Design a protein with these regions (language model features):
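Acidic helix/loop microenvironments that form the catalytic cleft of cell-wall polysaccharide enzymes
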Residues: 105-120, 220, 294-305
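Cell-envelope/ECM-targeting effectors and their regulatory/trafficking segments
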Residues: 20-26, 30, 34-203
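Short, conserved phosphate/pyrophosphate- and ester-handling motifs at nucleotide-, phospho-/glycolipid
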Residues: 129, 218, 243
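Extended, low-complexity, intrinsically disordered C-terminal regulatory tails
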Residues: 197-230
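N-terminal secretory signal peptides that target proteins for export/translocation
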Residues: 1-19
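Extracytoplasmic/secreted envelope proteins and their assembly/folding machinery
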Residues: 110-113, 133, 186-193, 210, ...
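Catalytic cores and adjacent binding grooves of peptidoglycan-active enzymes
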Residues: 232-305
Length: 305
């Protein structure tokens, strides 16, 4: 992974950038072929990797898979404003949405993506593109009642204090202590965290994982803070925050050394999206009534079951 990221980072503007892009495209294709060859070289008795199983239709989706192999790391785009390279940070959610366990660089994933594209009136190419992402993003946002309220020009009122409950010390992340959450949401969170630890050894081995570092935030205190910091309407904090509802939680899913647990740096978000905690949430949080905010791997909102 570091080798691929290093190549992506080497891209520059101008004629040299064009050459680097061509070079990266070639290398990405070679890496994909090498991975397949290595898997087959393990012998007939070796377990079949998921990506190899997803190569069940040889030839049909190979070109789309090759294009996805390149764009996964090299796509230059601005889906949320700041420039980003590649779409790896969003891959787990995309895999979940299109109903494919296949590696994003496999023909099987391309086939599933094409089926999704056709269902929503897009060109069924099997290639990830920005038009497809906009449809995906719309679906994810529509599942967040808070977002739909904001679209209507509403700012949801905070819950009565009697509906809030205190987190225990073991549920709070040390970097940012929080205190309150709506009672029914806290119960759902506890069930979810317990299930994650029971099902995933890596999560059970690290007591910090899935601890909460932001929950209910009093609207008046939040407004004063955003005014003081001059960051009221950016991606990181809004004047009308979903945390005012008592249904939003920021969960620790891991972080890069030297960066905050809620860093929006592209490298940070890409790292978080590949952690066992985040991948488990993508597949299972819905069982407990939680939906994600795609831009922030740590942010989840309870919408009921």
């Amino acid at each position: 992974m570091a080798r691929k990221e290093g190549l992506a980072a080497a891209l520059v503007l101008g004629p040299a950038g064009v050459m680097w892009r061509a070079f990266l495209s070639t290398v990405a294709a070679i890496l994909a072929l090498s991975a397949g060859s290595a898997a087959k070289a393990d012998g007939d008795d070796a377990p079949i990797p998921a990506a190899q199983v997803c190569d069940r239709t040889p030839g049909l989706w190979d070109e789309a898979a090759e294009a996805n192999t390149i764009s996964l790391y090299a796509l230059e785009w601005t889906p949320f404003g700041p420039a980003e390279m590649g779409w790896e940070a969003y891959a787990p959610l995309i895999q979940q949405e299109v109903g494919s366990p296949c590696d994003p660089v496999s023909p099987g994933f391309a086939e599933a993506l094409a089926t999704f594209q056709a269902r929503f009136g897009l060109t069924a190419s099997g290639r990830f593109d920005q038009a497809t992402f906009q449809v995906l993003r719309g679906l994810w946002q529509e599942r967040r009642p808070f977002v739909m309220a904001r679209v209507r020009g509403e700012c949801p009122a905070p819950p009565p204090i009697a509906d809030l409950a205190y987190l225990t010390t073991g549920e709070e992340h040390a970097e940012r202590l929080t205190r309150l959450l709506r009672r029914d949401v806290l119960e759902a969170y506890r069930e979810m965290a317990a299930a994650a630890r029971a099902e995933v050894p890596d999560i059970a081995a690290d007591p910090e994982l899935l601890r909460i570092f932001s929950s209910f935030r009093d609207p008046e205190a939040d407004a004063a803070r955003c005014a003081r910091e001059g960051n009221c309407d950016g991606l990181r904090r809004a004047a009308c925050s979903p945390h005012r509802t008592g249904t939003a939680v920021d969960l620790y899913v891991g972080h890069l050394h030297g960066l905050a647990v809620d860093s929006t740096d592209p490298h940070s978000r890409r790292y978080m999206s590949q952690t066992p905690a985040y991948r488990w949430l993508v597949k299972n949080a819905g069982r407990f009534g939680f939906v994600p905010y795609v831009y922030e791997p740590w942010h989840w909102e309870w919408v009921g079951r």
